Amino acid sequence: MSSPQLYQRGDVLLADLPFADVVRSKVRPVLVVQNDVANRLRDNLIVVAFSSRVPSLPLPTQYRVKANSPLAQRAGLVRDCVVDCSVIHTIAKSRIRRKIGSFTGEAMDEVDRCLKISLALA
């Protein structure tokens, strides 16, 4: 019997995310933002969504990742995108397809800044 996959904060995963109507879903990349203790103990993960709709000037709640940058390569991302910290999901681990990469500590610091703005914690 295989052991359950352990996910860490900063992992970039492909997940089957539901649309707002919850009837339909789409496989898309997400970034794990939940702490590692909860990641290990819970059946769910807190993630933020990536969007390929990149505005010319990202919002304060968005962190831009350019295709072909070292971060995009490390994260397994092939298109320009933004981490949209205004789109936060709690998803079951069963919705995860696979890990495609991870963010650096520096990039996660920027994501944390965006999350604080999104959640009015700053």
Give the residues covered by each predicted segment:
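Conserved functional hotspots at enzyme active or ligand-binding sites that engage polyanionic ligands
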Residues: 1-122
